[in-house]
Amino acid sequence: MRLRGLSIIFCTLAVAATIPAIAHHSFAAEFDINRPISLDGVVTRFELSNPHSWLHLEITTEAGEKQQWQVEGGAPNALIRRGWTRTSVPAGIQVHVEGFQARDRSFRASGREITLPDGSSLFMGSVGIGAPSTE
């Protein structure tokens, strides 16, 4: 009987420990689907690294102030299958990014699509839990 009780406690704790990981991988937990955002800026850095890629942009507002934005992209594996490489988005180029702003209204977003200077575009998102459909 004691072994059964310990097994139940252990299983309950194991399941409870996975909840933060599931929440972290939820689009809706971090980003607001009701706050689509369009960003035009200069790439300062692109990180094609696990678990998510990151595009760093310098945006100049209409008032002339500079903002440093971080745009989260999909996992490198997913982006590479869609045609991305480490040199797809070099520092210094002007890009247009569509996405969804962070719930905390920081200068952070989940990227949906990026348009490069030559007019080509790449899907930069993931199809995670709560993310808008790619269709």
Can you annotate each of these PLM segments?
Residues 8-20:
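Bacterial N-terminal signal peptides
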Residues 22-37:
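Short boundary/loop segments of OB/S1/cold-shock single-stranded nucleic-acid-binding domains
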Residues 41-43, 94:
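Conserved hydrophobic positions within beta-strands
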Residues 49-59:
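Short aromatic-glycine-enriched beta-strand elements
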Residues 62-74:
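A short macromolecule-binding patch
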Residues 73-81:
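Short, structured beta-strand/loop micro-motifs enriched in basic residues and often containing a Trp
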Residues 80-97:
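Short nucleic-acid-contacting surface segments enriched for D/E, G, S/T with interspersed K/R
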Residues 102-126:
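OB-fold/S1-family single-stranded nucleic acid-binding modules
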